[in-house]
Amino acid sequence: MYKRQGYRYFDTFGKEVSYPFGHGLSYTAFDYAVENAKMDADRCELKVSVKNIGKVAGREAVQLYVKAPNGGLDKPAKELKAFGKTALLQPGESQTLILTWNVMDMASFNEKNSSWELAKGEYQWMVAASSADVRCTAVQRVTKARKQKVHDAMRAQVPVAVYPMVKR
């Protein structure tokens, strides 16, 4: 299912790692809070407030992971869908980041049907400092499953003309 590498494998199968994906060191600390989460037919948007609660100035890389409902197709425990970085925040200062991504970025590929499929159900949007350090979450519901059919890249889309061999 997954190669034995990367946060998707390690998180899905509960393997411990020395440094989780997205891990970074800082001389300060940050607090996260979801301000707003919304999803329309095409786009997802999450507003997150990041506040420097430490004693020195610093920047923070904010990561957004999505946990999809079990729609019958294999999925990792969570997948990175968006990220952003704050400006240099002084102690006590905060900034709101707006993270956006396409709704179909949350879909799974169905090899049998050659289609991207967005399962119906609850999607957990996890705001994190790394793949192992989730700070806050929001939940959005997909009320109707969606499929986006694609074609086989190796299959000719129109019949290929057959040319007779030429003798030289």
Kindly give the residue locations of the regions a language model identified.
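Hydrophobic beta-strand core residues of beta-sandwich domains
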Residues: 38-39, 87-91, 118
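Short coil/turn motifs at secondary-structure junctions
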Residues: 53-55, 69-71, 104-106, 130-132
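Intrinsic-disorder/low-complexity, polar/charged segments enriched in Ser/Thr/Lys/Arg/Asp/Glu/Gln
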Residues: 43-45, 94-98, 135
